[in-house]
Amino acid sequence: MRRFCSLFVPAVFLVTTLLVTLAQPERCIAQSVTNAPQQSKDKEGDSSGQVSGAGKPAVAGSKASDADSGAKENTNSEVKKDAESTVQIGDDRNARFKTGRIIFPTYEFEMGKKRLFYGLYLPKNFVKSKTYPLVVVLHGLNGSPGQILAYPGLTKYADNEEYILVAPMGYNARGWYGSRGKGGGRGSEPRNLGELSEQDVMEVLKLTRKNFQIDPTRIYLFGHSMGGGGSMHLAMTYPQIWAAIAVIAPAAYGNRDRLATAKDIPAYVVQGDKDRLVSVQQTRRWVEKMKELGMKHEYIEVKNGGHVFLAWQHFDGIFSFFKANPKLPQQISPK
């Protein structure tokens, strides 16, 4: 009996270890897209300014910088594949970006004296010399760039329609992109949180236009909830930039008369009539103001739709709307 136990215990331990090991890669893959770098890790990264989806330092051209990092080590064939899907920017050999993957580059945000990350998606067939339309994507309250870029179907549309997607953090997860004013900081947050949140978006936009060939007539805004309110605020604040905007359950507050500054920007609005966080009445009032101003818009009210309904079901309409609404040449602003 003693001999049997001595053989049985190691065998059970070996089988258990094997099962845990086999399960581990699946867990890594499931978490890596949505787990963008944490703010406490934002200074980590290599000279390319990239960090991994798990907040670890990335090596340019390695698996650590893409959305399915940690799944397995590179083989020789994978290294070759990585090289083919990596775009070099400028003369710096380390300034490389993966194509067809959600990645999280970082940059030095001088106003906030802090290094911030943002989400970036280059379409699979990206060509550095080609000009592309751009969608600036804004996440909701307590969300992240990785979360909203992982909305099912979003990157697929970017591939099929050949869009670059960029998702700023907005300084932190609750900055409101300036839509609630320049302040709003709580506790240890900066007093000018709203201003920092807004300027993070504008700095990431500037950086993206510098790094890639962006069509100035086709720069769009898309946001959900807090990101929808932020999109409307940025459209009203910088109307010379945006060709069109698309908002889902927009948490938009403030004076609706400001919408007059964005009356030449077409808007695509989606709202659930059972939303308990952003009331349908509030969104209807914004849409009524659009009608009053003669603003080009489409309004889709989802019957029995809540706040977190299947927003991605509307990407077909959103991208069709974007395609149909480039900015007029005389309305283009300089970089």
What residues fall within each predicted segment?
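Primarily recognizes the serine-hydrolase "nucleophile elbow" in alpha/beta-hydrolase
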Residues: R209-N211, T217-K263
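A domain-start/cap signature at the N-terminus of enzymes
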Residues: C28-Y132, S197, M226, R284-E288, ...
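Sec-dependent N-terminal signal peptides
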Residues: M1-Q31
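C-terminal catalytic histidine-bearing segment of alpha/beta-hydrolase fold enzymes
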Residues: V270, R276, V280-K335
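Alpha/beta-hydrolase active-site loop
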Residues: E189-F212
